Amino acid sequence: NLDITLYIADNMTQSIFSSTTLSLKGVGKNPTKAYMSALKMINYKRPELKSFVEKGKNQIIEYYNSKCDFILKDAESLAGRKQFDEAIYTVTSIPDICKECYLKGKDVAINIFKQKLENECMQNIADARTAKAKDNYDLAASYLSNILPDVSCYNDAQILLKEIEDH
């Protein structure tokens, strides 16, 4: 005999959306084989499993719909602390079935990504200036080559690159 508990949960937030316990029986030459036999006997069409999954889906939707503003604020707070990747992950984890929150999350993700690019641009310019001051012009130029034309400091990067090339 084996009792197995199944969970639908979010490990990051420690939220449990649904759970169910199944009592199973299996036969085998040793306990491991008996457990494997029991697990193979799970009928995935059992009403309690369908109910378990449906409840989990509904709870996930309710969770994201009710906590959307908090999730978005948390992401913006992470971005404010320059934890851009974690912030983007937070908003891109919103399931698309939660349409309104998902769409808001996409907009926030785009803004955070732009902030990340701006931050990286400023960092690359600072690193390039440091390398230039040490007469390491190749390294300075390589920092500047990572800067995309879409960011606001691109022109500053081009001016610095021209100074390096003219040296």
Regions found by a protein language model. Give the residues of each.
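Surface-exposed short loop/turn segments
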Residues: 1-17
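C-terminal/domain-edge helix-coil "capping" segments
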Residues: 16-142, 149, 155-158, 162-167
